[in-house]
Regions:
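Catalytic-core regions of core metabolic enzymes
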Residues: 1-186
């Protein structure tokens, strides 16, 4: 289960109270949770999905999520336009349709307000009631910021990766719509 198992463990560690539905074609359980054999087997379309499969399979997963009404996805895999893979990122954008995606080549989003981590590691962060949202193209930058001990409460950490669908302005605007966000760091 790899990276996806890490995401499940981080949500559990942060006390996320919402449903978490791992999907794996052969495993019955991941991280102590029932695993579903396919997206079609889920109880309903997920609000948000961390996609931890290779770049070629990511396109198919995004298409299936979009068709079932998924709320959005983090596309973790690398090897898209940043590595010269011609046309694959355009296929991903077409597969997403109207569904927002962060990435590809994206580490994800951490929501310390609600304990929802679509991110493989939280790097020592803690739950907060309000705080700053940090946004970067590069996961490395916000990871390094998140590993620092600061007096500044961090509400969100988010990466854009290749920003194939959701761009900086759209993500920043969505984070600022949360009244618990006190400032935005880019």
């Amino acid at each position: 289960a790899g990276w996806a198992l890490n995401v499940i463990e981080q949500c559990q560690k942060m006390g996320f109270k919402g449903p978490v539905w791992p999907v794996h074609p052969t495993r019955a359980e991941i991280g102590g949770l029932k695993a579903y054999a396919s997206l079609a087997d889920l109880p309903e379309a997920p609000d948000a999905t961390f996609i931890g499969v290779n770049r070629f399979a990511t396109v198919d997963v995004v298409a299936e999520l979009a068709a079932m009404g998924g709320g959005g996805a983090i596309c973790f895999a690398s090897g898209w336009e940043e590595s010269g893979e011609a046309g694959l990122q355009e296929r991903l954008v077409a597969a997403a349709g109207d569904m927002p995606i962060l990435g590809p080549n994206c580490y994800g989003v951490i929501n310390y307000l609600d304990g929802a981590l679509l991110w493989p590691d939280q790097h020592g962060g803690i739950r907060v009631k309000n705080g700053v949202a940090l946004v970067s193209q590069s996961s490395n930058i916000v990871i390094n910021m998140g590993m620092q001990q600061r007096g500044l409460p961090v509400a969100y950490m988010a990466c854009l990766g290749n920003a194939a669908v959701v761009g900086l302005a759209e993500l920043a605007g969505a984070l600022l719509d949360d009244p618990r966000v006190t400032a935005l760091g880019l």
